[in-house]
């Protein structure tokens, strides 16, 4: 069996990686060194280790919580949203059903650790408050969602990380939420010490009765009572709340203003405030702030004028393995918050907030321009070199987010949750625009003489619609042809003859399917794959291409 030719160039990565490649000509330029010009296969074999190392996702990220990093970090520098979901699932002990473990998980362990530390000082802080604030009653203030009541199952199984206020109200009115792990016992302990227990929640006044009922039902007993439970008002705001925009108070204005009222008018001294959002805690009027972990949503709010509180700010640096395994050992704050990831992705694609990408100008398009410009520099020379060697030069292209652009489907239609039936509608209706810059590039390659192959994870029933979509958006006639366009066989059908030896029998991984098909293009059809192009690393690994060109895509991950 011929030796696999591993990929030897990755393009389209973040600037730092491109700079690394440029600084290492023995890897980045297959014809730079005289000894590497003996044969293509000698050259490729010499670079196996470097090539494989390059064809792996990033694991370190810098991301601001407001999404602004999408303007500067590049596609590979944005945490991939599917990897974020897997990391969150691991952290919460979710086995894939969208429900969190209620008995053991890294999340439960972290919350228990936080509350053990708090429990150790409950009595001493209570006594200190009595001494320092004579005539005032020591109090603890608690947020509700993911502070006292646990919303993971609603957020993930029911909503798939896309908030639905009507569905949320159903869960609230039906009192479906379990207690946040270890929190009910902690609140009962605090009440037994003598603390006044106060709830301040972003839930509406219409949800107060059901929320109190839910809290009592899951173990808080009578710790939370109507006089000491504050919800967002309907109608006129309370007189003790001061807001910059009177008709639209921020979370910090509402919660800090309520804490101020409790201390100034209710004769309480707030020893500690507890919340899962930084905006639950900002604005002062509490001796201590206790942040509970929650990477499943982010509710930002500006701090009050003059308040710095730099310690009450989200993380901006993260380490995350693509397979989700980081959820076993990083803290909740060490997981990229999924709402911040979504905002960063939207910024990167020029999405104004409606789930559609800008088709003319965005950081994503700017990155593709650089990538295509870089590839064009060697497009003709690589073709001529292959012809001089007596080879038939070919290029292999993936479809989704390589030649056809799926952002609007993935985000506006699916909200980052893949739906195979909806995807098939889009495919059969030929709804996809071209991936920016790729039409001219592919057509140029075809005009130079390259044979162009398509190699997609779409299935055989989608082949004709995909070819029609490609033609419709401008890929020149004869560029993508049925004979040179490979789709996956449908379940129950026989794989092509060249697909054999997959670890799962007739069920092949993406890497097995695509690398074996590239081997078929080379060894059975007689072509040399000069370059393979894809938005997923699994499009590219496995060899049988002189160069691997990675397009950026943080919107899904197919390992």
Give the label of every model feature segment.
Residues 2-142, 306-397:
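Non-catalytic pre-domain segments flanking phosphatase-related domains
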Residues 37, 43-56, 206-343, 359, ...:
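C-terminal cap/substrate-recognition subdomain and adjoining C-terminal extension
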Residues 74, 97-109, 169-177, 198-203, ...:
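Second-shell loop/turn segments in exported
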Residues 117, 121-128, 151-155, 186-196, ...:
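Structured segments of extracytoplasmic/periplasmic soluble domains
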Residues 125-139, 195-203, 227, 271-273, ...:
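Surface-exposed patches in mature extracellular/periplasmic domains of secreted proteins
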Residues 138-151, 199, 393-406, 454:
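Asp-based phosphoryl-transfer active-site loop
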Residues 146, 183-216, 230-231, 401, ...:
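Substrate-recognition element of Asp-dependent hydrolases with the DxDx(T/V) motif
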Residues 148-182, 388-389, 403-436:
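Active-site neighborhood of HAD-like aspartate-dependent phosphohydrolases
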């Amino acid at each position: 069996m011929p030796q696999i030719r591993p990929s030897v160039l990755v393009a389209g990565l973040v600037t730092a990686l491109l700079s690394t490649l440029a600084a290492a000509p023995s890897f980045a330029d297959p014809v730079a060194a005289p000894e590497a010009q003996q044969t293509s296969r000698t050259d490729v074999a010499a670079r196996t280790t470097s090539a494989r190392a390059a064809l792996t996702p990033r694991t370190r990220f810098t991301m601001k919580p407001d999404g602004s990093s999408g303007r500067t970090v590049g596609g590979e520098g944005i945490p991939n949203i599917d990897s974020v979901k897997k990391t969150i699932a691991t952290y919460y002990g979710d086995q894939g059903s969208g429900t969190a473990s209620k008995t053991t998980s890294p999340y439960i362990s972290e919350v228990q650790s936080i509350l053990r530390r708090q429990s150790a000082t409950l009595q001493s802080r209570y006594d200190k408050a009595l001494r320092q604030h004579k005539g005032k009653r020591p109090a603890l203030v608690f947020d509700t969602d993911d502070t006292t009541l646990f919303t993971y199952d609603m957020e993930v199984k029911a909503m798939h990380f896309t908030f639905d206020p009507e569905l949320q109200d159903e869960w609230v009115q039906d009192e479906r939420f379990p207690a946040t792990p270890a929190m009910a016992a902690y609140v009962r302990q605090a009440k037994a010490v003598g603390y006044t227990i106060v709830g301040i929640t972003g839930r509406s006044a219409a949800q107060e009765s059901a929320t109190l009922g839910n809290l009592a039902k899951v173990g808080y007993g009578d710790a939370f009572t109507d006089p000491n439970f504050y919800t967002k008002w309907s109608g006129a705001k309370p007189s003790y709340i001061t807001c910059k925009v009177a008709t639209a108070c921020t979370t910090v204005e509402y919660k800090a203003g309520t804490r101020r009222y409790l201390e100034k008018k209710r004769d309480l001294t707030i020893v500690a405030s507890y919340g899962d959002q930084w905006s639950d805690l900002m604005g002062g009027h509490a001796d201590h702030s206790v942040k509970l972990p929650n990477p499943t949503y982010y509710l930002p709010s500006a701090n009050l004028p003059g308040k710095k509180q730099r310690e009450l700010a989200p993380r901006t640096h993260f380490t995350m393995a693509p397979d989700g395994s980081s959820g076993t050992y990083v803290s909740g704050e060490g997981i990229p918050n999924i709402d911040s990831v979504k905002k960063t992705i939207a910024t990167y694609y020029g999405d104004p907030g409606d789930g559609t990408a800008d088709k003319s100008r965005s950081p994503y398009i700017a990155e593709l321009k650089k990538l295509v410009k870089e590839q064009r520099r060697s497009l003709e020379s690589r073709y001529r070199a292959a012809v001089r060697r007596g080879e038939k030069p070919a290029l292999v292209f993936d479809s989704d987010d390589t030649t056809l652009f799926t952002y609007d489907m993935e985000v506006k239609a699916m909200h980052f949750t893949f739906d195979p039936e909806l995807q098939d509608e889009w495919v059969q209706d030929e709804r996809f625009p071209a991936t920016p810059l790729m039409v001219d590039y592919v057509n140029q390659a075809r005009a130079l003489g390259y044979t162009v192959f398509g190699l997609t994870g779409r299935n055989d029933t989608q082949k004709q619609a995909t070819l029609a979509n490609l033609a419709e958006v401008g890929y020149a006639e004869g560029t993508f042809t049925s004979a040179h366009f490979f789709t996956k066989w449908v379940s129950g059908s026989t794989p092509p003859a060249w697909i054999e030896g997959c670890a799962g029998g007739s069920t092949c991984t993406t890497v097995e399917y695509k690398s074996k098909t590239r081997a078929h293009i080379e060894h059975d059809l007689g072509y040399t794959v000069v370059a393979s192009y894809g938005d997923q690393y699994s499009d590219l690994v496995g060899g049988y291409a002189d160069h691997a060109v990675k397009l950026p895509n943080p919107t899904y991950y197919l390992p």
